[in-house]
Regions:
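Gram-negative bacterial Sec-dependent N-terminal signal peptides
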Residues: 1-19
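Catalytic metal-binding/acid-base residues of hydrolase active sites
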Residues: 73
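Extracellular beta-rich repeat passengers
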Residues: 20-61, 66, 77-100, 112-314, ...
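Conserved H-D interstitial segment of serine endopeptidase catalytic domains
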Residues: 106
Length: 615
């Protein structure tokens, strides 16, 4: 189905080839500079005939709206911490929508809005030039054209893709055979990848959070809270017990612009539609990275759908509290977690897709799910309702039709706090997943941390009507179903899913799960002598630099599932007017003829442009 959008791609390529480069600094109308920060002073209206440079951290504030039309490309400079830059003392480009700002980013299929890197190509090479100091963007980009960018769109028409950008390698990992496959001997944790090439997109709202200023069961005053026996003083700019300052920013200078959270669940930060966020995740400091898309206290008045995060150095999408509802979300080939939830997130989600790398160094949890950063030792969980108690917002997101695919046997070898599972449940998390497909984690399917058991046993964690397969080496045994996390290695909570609730403290929370049926059709798995070491693994990328296909790897079709899944009538009915009734499991319509309709990822994602599928 790629060819159906080729004319749109040609138009997008032509526009991009003729685009000018515009830097969003203090010389741009409606933007001021204070120290190293950029702030809006009026509404910003971009045009798709230019490509825009984020020269640092740009804050949308002062009740301004940042308007981005379809087909626009926005590029962040690589910061000094990026492996693709030189110099010191400057941060990468990021766009931050503060609580008093709005974003209006409405792309369309065939002309998405793309956030990516402003890294320039080395002279005479297609690789990024790592010797450039980007601290003076006006000088760096003087005399440059869009064809000088590392990921220029000028080759789009030649490749015949339906996306506005060309196929790009997500990694510079070496290969050790003629097909470009990667083995353990060819990789290590120091190998550079096409990540950390700019910052990311951050949206901050005024919806409730459970930021964690809690000592036992008491909300702590004066911006101080106790966790794990330690008293933590917070920045003085926060004046509410459930306000926080978002990670990934230089906090002392940013001040209140970085705050999120508040009392308004219906708060609106604007609109994101058909937006692809690529190659970001700059490190500001140890444990202070920027996610591809960060949403702090974002309310359900915000519209977020058709959003992709591709090849980010940190998490793909992270929710810090808030109530925002999302659908048609894709996280592909990111280094850390795919969907991370923290601090009392209560939004709804549908059609979420995760596709992790099989390069052995990328991809942590598909879902790292935390409740709140609080000390629960004195909270009487059995007396707390499923939503909140005494002002404490407890997490309870509800997700329908997710497809999460880990890296399989060739997933991440660099373990994070134990094992890399499809899910980690901790910090008093509660929430629900229905009608989904979860497969191919390198380690166990679910790890329940020592501080995740209480709400699990209360029935506040729900997994119903889902398919699970290929998680850990033995794939389908109870012993391999759960990974270990934290000091408690004997609690077998995750077996409740494997046993469909039999013997569980809350059996109804884990009914109608299937753990012995491979959800994917044989065409989606590798087999044959040409690449026997990968037999049984999910097919990954089939695009290589020469423009040919890998016959042995083929392409993965996320709508192509086994007959057992396609014919399964056990579908849990939707529970909210937000959800779209869907008579199938997973993120893609498996009931329809897969050859006669597009995947919802086609025509705007890197997942599509890189030929991950054969469509």
């Amino acid at each position: 189905m790629k060819k159906t959008l080729l004319s749109t791609a040609l138009i997008a390529a032509t526009i991009s080839a003729n685009a000018g480069i515009v830097i969003l600094d203090e010389t741009f109308a409606g933007i001021s500079k204070s120290g190293s920060l950029y702030k809006t002073t009026s509404d910003i209206n971009l045009v798709s005939t230019n490509e825009y440079i984020l020269p640092g951290q740009l804050f949308v504030t002062n009740n301004n709206t940042f308007n981005i039309p379809q087909g626009t490309v926005i590029r962040g400079i690589p910061g000094a911490a990026s492996p693709f830059s030189a110099g010191s003392g400057y941060v990468g480009g990021s766009l931050i929508v503060s609580r008093d700002g709005q974003i209006n980013a409405e792309g369309v299929k065939g002309a998405p809005i793309i956030f990516t890197t402003a890294a320039l190509k080395a002279s005479g090479s297609t690789l990024p030039d790592a010797t450039i100091n980007y601290s003076d963007p006006a000088t760096v980009f003087s005399g440059k054209s869009v064809s000088d960018f590392w990921d220029t769109a000028s080759t789009t028409a030649a490749t015949g893709t339906s996306s506005a950008m060309p196929p790009l390698s997500y990694s510079t990992l070496p290969s050790n055979d003629s097909t470009g496959d990667i083995s353990a001997s060819a990789t290590d944790d120091t190998t550079e990848q096409y990540q950390k090439m700019w910052g990311g997109l951050v949206i901050l709202g005024s919806a409730p959070t459970s930021i964690g200023r809690i000592s036992g069961s008491v909300i702590a005053p004066n911006n101080v809270y106790t966790k794990d026996g330690k008293t933590v003083a917070l920045e003085t700019v926060t004046n509410d017990p459930f306000e926080g300052q978002i990670e990934g920013l230089v906090v002392p200078e940013v001040g209140e612009l970085s705050c999120y959270g508040g009392p308004n669940p219906n708060d609106s930060s604007g609109t994101l539609r058909f937006v692809s966020i690529r190659h970001g995740g700059e490190d500001i400091g140890t444990g202070n990275e920027i996610n591809g898309l960060t949403m702090g206290g974002v309310g359900y008045g915000t519209k977020v759908e058709y959003v992709e995060v591709y090849s980010n150095n940190d998490d793909g999408v992270e929710f810090f509290g808030g109530t925002v509802n999302t659908r048609y979300m894709a996280v592909v080939a990111c280094a850390d977690d795919s969907f991370d939830m923290d601090e009392g997130f209560t939004g709804l989600g549908q059609f979420w897709f995760v596709f992790q790398s099989d390069d052995q160094i990328n991809g942590d949890q598909c879902g790292e799910h935390d409740g709140t950063k609080a000390n629960y030792s004195s909270i009487a969980w059995s007396n707390i309702g499923a939503s909140k108690e005494g002002g404490l917002t407890l997490s309870f997101p509800t997700i329908y039709n997710a497809t999460y695919i880990g890296g399989g046997n060739y997933g991440n070898r660099a373990q994070d706090s134990g094992t890399n599972c499809l899910f980690t449940i901790r910090d008093g998390f509660g929430g629900a997943y229905y009608n989904s497909i979860f497969s191919d984690a390198r380690d166990g399917a679910v790890a329940v941390a020592d501080d995740g058991h209480s709400r699990w046993d209360l029935g506040h964690v729900i997994f119903k009507n889902n398919y699970w397969y290929g998680n850990a080496a033995a794939f389908t045994t109870a012993e391999d179903f759960q990974g270990t996390r934290g000091p408690d290695t004997t609690n077998n909570d995750a077996y409740d899913i494997y046993n469909n609730g039999s013997g569980a403290a809350a059996p109804s929370a884990f009914s109608d799960n299937v753990v012995t049926v491979d959800p994917w059709a044989a065409a989606n798995r590798i087999s044959g002598a040409a690449d026997s070491s990968y037999d049984g693994q999910i097919k990954r990328r089939n695009w290589v630099a020469t423009g040919t296909y890998r016959a042995n790897h083929g392409g993965f079709d996320p709508a192509e599932v086994s007959t057992a899944v396609a014919n399964d009538a056990t579908i849990y009915p939707v529970s909210s007017t937000f959800f779209i009734p869907a008579a199938f499991h997973g993120a893609f319509n498996i009931e329809a003829d897969s050859n006669s309709q597009d995947l919802w990822t086609e025509g705007w994602t890197a997942f599509d442009a890189l030929y991950y599928t054969d469509r």
